Design a protein with these regions (language model features):
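Non-catalytic, glycine-rich low-complexity segments
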Residues: 1-40, 103-133
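Beta-rich interaction modules in large eukaryotic scaffold/regulatory proteins
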Residues: 22, 30, 55-74
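Basic K/R-rich, polyanion-interacting modules in nucleoproteins and related proteins
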Residues: 25-31, 159-166
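Hydrophobic core residues within well-ordered beta-strands of beta-rich domains
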Residues: 31, 45, 82-84
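Short solvent-exposed strand-capping/beta-turn motif centered on an Asx-Ser/Thr pair
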Residues: 38-42, 79-81
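Short beta-strand elements bearing conserved aromatic residues within extracellular beta-rich modules
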Residues: 47-49
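Extended acidic/polar, glycine-enriched regions
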Residues: 63-165
Length: 166
């Protein structure tokens, strides 16, 4: 199917008259944004609020955090007077889906070598966005994932909280 969207974003708040009128805030006040964000299935999803002042060229981004059910929330600060534009963006996080699926297989004592090779590809794809210390960790993880003699270390890295955070 063409143009198939897997992420649904509804009930973005605050808004007035379905977004036809601007909300009001003063300088240094926070805009608390909530939205219902969900997907068709059990994939791990992530979302963010993108915002910018009317005179800015670049969008700023704040990651949203899940609260109850399918509701997500985040806040950004009004830093200068004027009009701000914001929207919520959501996506399926394939790397986190890989990590959660691999973790379940490891807990079930399954051999996950092919999953580790897949993980090495995910790790390599995010290296350019990583900080120097994160890149060092990712390079170590990718090396372990592709070296069968380091399988035990590789599965520990695959399900690590550090990898999850990156």
């Amino acid at each position: 199917m063409q143009n198939q969207t897997r992420i649904v974003i509804e009930n973005v708040m605050p808004q007035l008259d379905c977004g036809s009128n601007p909300i009001k805030r003063i300088v240094n006040q926070k805009v608390n944004v909530t939205a219902a964000v969900f997907s068709d299935g059990h994939d791990v999803i992530e979302c963010c609020v993108k915002f910018k002042h009317e005179n800015d060229k670049k969008w700023q981004e704040v990651r949203m955090k899940p609260s109850v059910n399918d509701e997500w929330s985040a806040a950004f600060k009004v830093e200068k007077q004027g009009f701000y534009t914001y929207f919520v963006e959501g996506w399926v996080d394939y790397a986190l889906n890989w990590q959660h699926g691999t973790e379940r297989k490891i807990q079930d004592n399954q051999y996950v070598k092919s999953e580790l090779l897949e993980g090495a590809e995910y790790v390599k794809s995010v290296m350019e966005l990583a900080t120097d210390s994160e890149r060092e960790y990712l390079e170590k993880a990718a090396a372990h994932f592709t070296n069968e003699s380091e399988y035990d270390q590789a599965i520990q890295l695959a399900v690590s909280a550090e990898l999850h955070q990156i």
